[in-house]
Amino acid sequence: MQSIPIKNVGADNVSQLIDRFERQYVYLRLSVTDVCNFRCNYCLPDGYKPPSHKQQFLSVSEIQRVVRAFADLGTEKVRITGGEPTLRKDFLEIAHTVSQTNGIKKVALTTNGYRMERDIDLWQQAGITDINVSVDSLDTRQFQLITGENKLQSILKGIDRAFEIGYRKIKVNAVLMKQYTAPELDKFLVWIKDKPIQMRFIELMETGEMDSFFQAQHLSGQSVMQRLLQEGWQLQPKALSDGPAKVLSHPDYQGEIGLIMPYEKNFCASCNRLRVSALGKLHLCLFGEEGIDLRDLLSEDTQQAQLEARLKAALQGKREHHYLHIGDSGIRNNLASIGG
């Protein structure tokens, strides 16, 4: 896909999602479930606990309507997230539905990789164009310690299979932690030397349930950035639909490094994504307050104009930046409910 110049928004601005700060939103992160089967120490260390009241996640038809509205307003990329989205029995139908929406050019999946080895061929057939998979350690025992699951070797086989069936690049996520991830940096670099993997280190973010863990494990991505720059890695330009990662490449490496540093100054200046939760709420920011309900406008196709009007109106309430730097993570107790 050709990248779109960031400054040249185009003549048809009226139909686009643009906020008060001239940021254009072409990227939707769509959560389809809160449920996750991993127990990652930085997210859900005690595992997923269902709420006392029964929750009904978005149906395929509701997903179709919300994606259609976003696409009509200029969204080009949808990332399906969770929880773990592949746990839904109708996941393949969801992926196919999103991929068939007019205007959507990329359908990405964020997964813990639990079913990747088994189902990667089916994901591709359903229309998944891009995959992000979490690998917080390349050591089997350490991986199980972090995630609560002994699935590392299966996930690595799933990544290899993705390349075999034609995926040109796989993005691999690892949360940057002093005790766990940081000591394995050299091992990750060796791994991506001859593989087209974008290895993304995500700064640990402070959330309501994880304050003490954050204090013990947080490591600035800038320290990794400085080391890489000193070793000959170079920053790469970004396309409009790209995520927040600062991407570095090296002439001796087939893979890349991505650094996601939400505490960095001006992190929000290039924000290009909105979020819809599995319960049908629009979230203007990962660390914002209570979401804006869309579900009452997702039951009939005839409601699309009203839905688009609500999206555009809600966007004008988006803040210029988050307040993580002063310890305000909004109402977010963990990241599983909205897909990070």
UniProtKB/Swiss-Prot annotation:
Binding of GTP, residues: 29, 79, 110, 171, 273-275
Enzyme class of the recorded protein, top EC level: lyase
PROSITE patterns xref list: MOAA_NIFB_PQQE (PS01305), RADICAL_SAM (PS51918)
Domain of life: Bacteria
Segments forming domain Radical SAM core: 20-246
InterPro entries tied to this protein: Aldolase_TIM, Elp3/MiaA/NifB-like_rSAM, MoaA, MoaA_NifB_PqqE_Fe-S-bd_CS, MoaA_twitch, MoCo_biosynth_MoaA/MoaC, rSAM
Residues given in the record as [4Fe-4S] cluster 2 binding sites: 268, 271, 285
Lyase recorded as keyword: yes
Pathway(s) it belongs to: Cofactor biosynthesis; molybdopterin biosynthesis
Binding site for [4Fe-4S] cluster 1: 36, 40, 43
Cofactor binding note: Binds 2 [4Fe-4S] clusters. Binds 1 [4Fe-4S] cluster coordinated with 3 cysteines and an exchangeable S-adenosyl-L-methionine and 1 [4Fe-4S] cluster coordinated with 3 cysteines and the GTP-derived substrate.
Gene3D superfamilies: Aldolase class I
Binding locations of S-adenosyl-L-methionine: 42, 83, 134, 205
Enzyme Commission number, as recorded: 4.1.99.22
UniProt GO BP: Mo-molybdopterin cofactor biosynthetic process
Keyword line: 4Fe-4S, GTP-binding, Iron, Iron-sulfur, Lyase, Metal-binding, Molybdenum cofactor biosynthesis, Nucleotide-binding, S-adenosyl-L-methionine
Keyword field contains Transmembrane: no
Catalyzed chemical reaction(s): GTP + AH2 + S-adenosyl-L-methionine = (8S)-3',8-cyclo-7,8-dihydroguanosine 5'-triphosphate + 5'-deoxyadenosine + L-methionine + A + H(+)
Function summary: Catalyzes the cyclization of GTP to (8S)-3',8-cyclo-7,8-dihydroguanosine 5'-triphosphate.
Record family assignment: Belongs to the radical SAM superfamily. MoaA family.
Record's subunit section: Monomer and homodimer.
Name of the protein: GTP 3',8-cyclase
Organism, as annotated: Actinobacillus pleuropneumoniae serotype 7 (strain AP76)
